[in-house]
Amino acid sequence: MNSPPSSAPRAESWGRGLLICLLLAAACLNGNAAQLTETRVTEVAKEVKLGPAQAAQRRAGVGESVREGDAINTGAAGRSELTFADQTIVRLGAKTIVSFSDGTRTMELGEGAMLFQIPKGAREARIKTGAIAVSSTGATGIIERHANFYIKCLVLEGTVRCYLTNRVGESLLVQSGQILITKPDVIALPEPAHFDIARVMKTCVLIRDFPPLLSQRLIESEEQKQSKLMAQGTYIPSNLVIFGRGTLVTLVNSTPAPSQKPQTNTGH
């Protein structure tokens, strides 16, 4: 009498197949994770250096990868653009120092000006400078730091959250058409002011001297909304203009308020 065939070879084959599937799945997940955090240099103008933050840096070139722990440093006339795998874009103005951590999704602005464009639905990106951090999952804006004198953050479209890194619960939302101006060692966030989006789009070198942003239509939509409100007299932006290395905000055409006539006592 013949004994039934053993099931051991079949089970062993099935086990091998399962192991191969698991290894392939793990490889795919690791590849996707690397893609999500991969950042490359896509534009270089004049002097731009890249490398580990605490080591000698090399001249950056288009196509180079930016890794966690790296820093990028632009010269007096230098500019650069970085592109993430999810189409997040960061542009750096002259005399700007930025370091990267958390798989490059957290950036620290030590000095200078940077534009950020974070597509809607992208993984959250954070920018730290001084006592302030800015985070968003969908917005286009500009942030500038000048030594210990000031920090400026303005939003062209979308919404960003600004918060203090040394005080829990101290945060506010900055919407499109708003600008936050404060000091690097601030202990309480001021209310944001308004600015003219169209004027910034015309004067900012981080926009004017680069190809159009992917969020261009969203910004134009915000411009149109502003124009309608300004025509109705319900929206009065601050008289700010963008000059210099990227976002040097300066008052222009400043007109003093008319003096009020002294009131006359009529005896009533």
PLM regions with names:
Residues V41, L109, S136-G138, V174:
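Hydrophobic residues on conserved beta-strands that form the core of alpha/beta folds
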Residues V44, I72-V134, C153-C162:
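Short, small-residue-rich packing micro-motifs
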